[in-house]
Swiss-Prot record:
TM spans (from-to): none
Domain of life: Bacteria
Entry-linked Pfam families: EFG_C, GTP_EFTU, LepA_C
Keyword Cell membrane: yes
UniProt-recorded name of the protein: Elongation factor 4
Gene Ontology CC terms: plasma membrane
Length: 601
């Protein structure tokens, strides 16, 4: 067991692409966690999706032994965190297990919105924040400007910020020395009753639930009986250890240490994240303050293409939920798509990642409906109901008002692109709250409806500022707005999975775009297919997929007109009969058309 004064627990926080994972690689190399043969780039981004997209999704923890210049050996437990706004809850969970954080800032790009948001989270939790300037070897690096930006925008002193290049390894050993000096050691009670916080869990098919824990007080050892406080169930610890990034078994984890625990828990919900572990024979009375529950902001329906896969989808979602506490799902039935699940996500990136993981790791074919946000509906009898699926909207005569979620978006943008960003926000029905010049950057604050931000705001913001603007957001309130439900009818039948809730001012255009787009996607049938967009009982747009027809007059050479007319009338009657009983299969592209219309309009 390591003496607490020689333990340092810290996280690395930064904006996307500022070099967190590369810096983690250098730490592992310097402290000899892996041999050169095992070393790979971004060794901690273990999921295929993480490596392909070049982003960190799951926070990973590593324990390294560092021989410092004063001769002492320090145990460094560090957690590599994601930088994307959709995964900010992963960051706050990692910070709860640390005493300090490294704020990594790109010396060329300067401070960006996520670094600010994550840094405030760290300061709120009382952590010691060390600013670090990375990519110092770039020709465009400007350390003096970035240091003044850190002081102006975030408000922490940065004149002593360590300058490093994680790619070449320059300055990293100096950073390790600073880290040991400035980040405080843990202050747990090594002799007290056991209290350990579950930072993360995942499901292993052989071991059951594996939990990543931070021991706060006491110690946890092999063959000890432990109790999970929220469920009250006891389990026997089968193995425990640390990641160096490879799993290394140990017999004891002492106060202040971070490691993994396997206790043969087979129930997926047996060790929820944020829970407290204690010893069965000498339990603690108080659980540790856990994490606040994250509320999903974006909802979409996930349906298996083959209805036989429904159970496999349920099992896959359960396993993912253990690893990703922010995923929310419940069963639902659609007339068009059969049985499936209504899933809640933190944002569009989160939704894409979950869908990709389900398709890759669990080998499922899925249909996804267009994402929607949660609306509040005030009914005429005085009750207020949340609605996350347009199909669940009460009839118009029962609705007093519909309220949509409003967020506060904090945007950092270079001055040259300010005009383009402001006009984008106004187009999205935004209200400007604040504008502040800081060095070469401008800090903007806008109130925007979440439904306008969910789909493509991030992509459009990046393209209108050439990738320089950055943004993060927080939920403010629900606010009444003139919203209507837009239904799509195919041959007079409503397709529930294609319904949308839209703002009244753009409903006509949205309906027209949508039926035109559907016309190209629905395959031609032997009979005419009418595609209509309706608000309530009023049809606002229509397009028709023309029927394929056989030339019934091909065999008539000349002859009387009545003979030809008889054949044409017979064909017409057949088509009419067909149209009454004909069923149309709607391809997956048609469901995605709803998304694209939202993005293009």
């Amino acid at each position: 067991m390591t003496d607490q004064t020689h333990i340092r627990n810290f996280s690395i926080i930064a904006h996307i692409d500022h070099g967190k994972s590369t810096l983690a690689d250098r730490f592992i190399q310097i402290c000899g966690g892996l041999s050169d043969r095992e070393m790979a780039e971004q060794v901690l981004d273990s999921m295929d999706i993480e490596r392909e997209r070049g982003i960190t999704i799951k926070a990973q923890s590593v324990t390294l032994d560092y021989q410092s210049r004063d001769g002492g050996i320090y145990q460094l437990n560090f957690i590599d965190t994601p930088g994307h706004v959709d995964f900010s809850y992963e960051v706050s969970r990692s910070l709860a297990a640390c005493e300090g954080a490294l704020l990594v800032v790109d010396a060329a790009q300067g401070v960006e919105a996520q670094s600010v948001a994550n840094c405030y989270t760290a300061i709120e939790q009382g952590l010691e924040v060390l600013p670090v300037l990375n990519k110092i070897d770039l020709p465009s690096a400007d350390p003096a400007r970035v240091k003044s930006e850190i002081e102006e925008i975030i408000g922490i002193p940065a004149e002593d910020a360590v300058e490093i290049s994680a790619k070449t390894g320059f300055g990293v050993d100096l950073l390790l020395e600073e880290l040991v000096k400035k980040i405080p050691p843990p202050k747990g009670d090594a002799e007290g009753p056991l209290q350990a916080l579950i930072i993360d869990s995942w499901f292993d098919n052989y071991l059951g639930v594996v939990s990543l824990v931070r021991v706060v007080n006491g110690a946890i050892s092999r063959k000890q009986k432990i109790t999970i406080m929220s469920t009250g169930k006891s389990h026997l610890v089968e193995k425990l250890g640390v990641f160096t990034p490879k799993p290394l078994d140990k017999t004891v984890l002492g106060a202040g240490e971070v490691g993994f625990v396997v206790a043969g828990i087979k129930d997926i919900f047996g060790a929820p994240v944020g829970d407290t572990i204690t010893a069965t024979d000498r339990p603690t009375t108080e659980p540790l303050p856990g994490f606040q529950k994250v509320q999903p902001r974006v909802f979409a329906g996930l349906y298996p293409v083959e209805s036989d896969d429904y159970e496999s989808l349920r099992e896959a979602l359960n396993k993912l939920h253990l690893n990703d506490a922010a995923l929310h799902f419940e069963p639902e039935v659609s007339q068009a798509l059969g049985f499936g699940f209504r899933c809640g996500f933190l944002g569009m990136l989160h939704m894409e990642i979950i869908q990709e993981r389900l398709e890759r790791e669990y080998d499922l074919d899925l249909i996804t409906t267009a994402p929607t946000v949660v609306y509040e509906v005030a009914k005429s009898d005085g009750t207020v109901v949340p609605v996350d699926n347009p199909a669940d909207l009460p009839p118009p005569n029962e609705i007093e008002e519909i309220r949509e979620p409003i967020i506060e978006a904090n945007i950092l943008v270079p001055q040259d692109y300010l005009g383009a960003v402001i006009s984008l926000c106004i187009e999205k029905r935004g209200v400007q709250k604040k504008l502040q010049y800081m060095g070469g950057q401008v800090a903007l604050s806008f109130e925007l409806p979440l439904s306008e931000v969910v789909l493509d705001f991030f992509d459009r913001l990046k393209s209108c500022s050439r990738g320089f603007a950055s943004f993060d957001y927080e939920f403010l309130r629900f606010q009444a707005a003139p919203l209507v439900k837009l239904d799509i009818l195919i041959n007079g039948e409503k397709v529930d999975a294609l319904s949308l809730i839209v703002h009244r001012d753009i409903s006509m255009n949205r309906g027209r775009d949508l039926v035109e787009r559907m016309k190209d996607l629905i395959p031609r049938q032997m009979f005419e297919v009418a595609i209509q967009a309706a608000i309530g009982s009023k049809i606002i747009a229509r397009s028709t997929v023309k029927a394929m027809r056989k030339n019934v007059l091909a065999k008539c050479y000349g002859g009387d007109i009545t003979r030809k007319r008889k054949l044409l009338e017979k064909q017409k009657a057949g088509k009419k009969r067909m149209k009454q009983v004909g069923k149309i299969d709607i391809p997956q592209e048609a469901f995605l058309a709803v998304l694209r219309v939202n993005k293009d309009s």
